């Protein structure tokens, strides 16, 4: 009986007129089930011990009836079909857009639908995405769940979401443009104001005389010891020194000195490289040295640019107490000297 069943189905299919679409659909489905050995409707079991690969398929409906003006097929495919390819690679599944409206040429789609061939039978169904998985049972259902979660993002009728913006950027890149044409990334020397380096600007001072150009500062993160003058460029304002405003206005015939030569080595401290390894190494090394190495003399901490040492401070103190410049300091012991008997009298 089974040997004659398949030839009878094939003969009946050939005798049917193409206008009987539903009859052809039922015959094709029966032929497909018989060829796959699914003629008997028997309950299927999953053997997780052997862990044999199983085939899992699911149809996902595309909401074209609710949103007829939105191009879901174009959003699913993406530029040159790359979006659907990446989605299949990420979920490890096979996806196919099937159903009515899945082909661009509507006339050809109608012709293939009326042809009655089994491979074009899906054109009679609603527009959907067929997800197929071939893997062990647990892995198959995990992949299917991942695919259903990811494909849901493509079925939202939004023209300005992240997926659409990425597709437009990819389309621009494929058409010959740059992938990052909207926001160019340029590392190295930047035209913007750099961090830690002041741009030399010439300003008008009081009396109409041009002031001196601003000195180039030390990059951020590199501390300088107190009392030590920087050798880079002109001397900047420090503690104890008069500000340029307090020095008075220069005479009318005064000419400012030529600006100092610009050092090319400052180019490495621009904004883009501010968080690079060079910046970190210099800043952390300088901080480690300043906290680990003890001070060599008191002038490193107490000399604020006056040019005075420890002797000058000592002589000034003695003159204040003795009220005489030419007498030797008194040999009287200071009160802070250690005594054997703290409560003894003088």
Swiss-Prot record:
Compositional bias (Pro residues): 253-262
Main localization, broad class: nucleus
KH domain segment(s): 61-127
Tissue expression per record: Ubiquitous. Highly expressed in brain, heart, testis and in Sertoli cells at all stages of spermatogenesis. Expressed in neurons. Detected in cortical layers of the forebrain and in the CA1 to CA4 regions of the hippocampus.
Gene Ontology, cellular component aspect: nucleoplasm; nucleus; protein-containing complex
GO molecular function: identical protein binding; mRNA binding; protein domain specific binding; RNA binding; SH3 domain binding; single-stranded RNA binding
Post-translational modification: Phosphorylated on tyrosine residues.
Similarity comment: family membership: Belongs to the KHDRBS family.
Name of the protein in its database record: KH domain-containing, RNA-binding, signal transduction-associated protein 3
Natural source organism: Rattus norvegicus (Rat)
């Amino acid at each position: 009986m089974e040997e004659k069943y398949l030839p009878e189905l094939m003969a009946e299919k050939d005798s049917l007129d193409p206008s009987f679409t539903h009859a052809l659909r039922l015959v094709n489905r029966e032929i497909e089930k018989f060829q796959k050995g699914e003629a008997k409707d028997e309950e299927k079991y999953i053997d997780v011990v052997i862990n044999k690969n199983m085939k899992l398929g699911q149809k996902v409906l595309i909401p074209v009836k609710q949103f007829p003006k939105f191009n879901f097929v174009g959003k699913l495919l993406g530029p040159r079909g790359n979006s659907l390819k990446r989605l299949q690679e990420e979920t490890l599944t096979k996806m196919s857009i099937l159903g009515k409206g899945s082909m661009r040429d509507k006339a050809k789609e109608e012709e293939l639908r009326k042809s009655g061939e089994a491979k074009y039978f899906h054109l009679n169904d609603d527009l959907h995405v067929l997800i197929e998985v071939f893997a062990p049972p647990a892995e198959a259902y995990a992949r299917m769940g991942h695919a259903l979660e990811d494909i849901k993002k493509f079925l939202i009728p939004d023209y300005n979401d992240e997926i659409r913006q990425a597709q437009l950027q990819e389309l621009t890149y494929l058409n010959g443009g740059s992938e990052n044409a909207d926001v160019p990334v340029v590392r190295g020397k930047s035209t913007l104001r750099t961090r830690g380096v002041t741009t030399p600007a010439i300003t008008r001072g009081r009396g109409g005389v041009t002031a001196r150009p601003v000195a180039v500062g030390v990059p951020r993160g590199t501390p300088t010891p107190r009392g030590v003058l920087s050798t880079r460029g002109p001397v900047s304002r420090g503690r104890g020194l008069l500000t340029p405003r307090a020095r008075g206005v220069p005479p009318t015939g005064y000419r400012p000195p030529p600006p100092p030569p610009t050092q090319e080595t400052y180019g490495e401290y621009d904004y883009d490289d501010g968080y690079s390894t060079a910046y970190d190494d210099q800043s952390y090394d300088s901080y480690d040295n300043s906290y680990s190495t003890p001070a060599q003399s008191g002038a490193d901490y107490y000399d604020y640019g006056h040019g005075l040492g420890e002797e000058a401070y000592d002589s000034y103190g003695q003159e204040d107490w003795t009220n005489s410049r030419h007498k030797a300091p008194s040999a009287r012991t200071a009160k802070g000297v250690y005594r054997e008997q703290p409560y003894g009298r003088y």
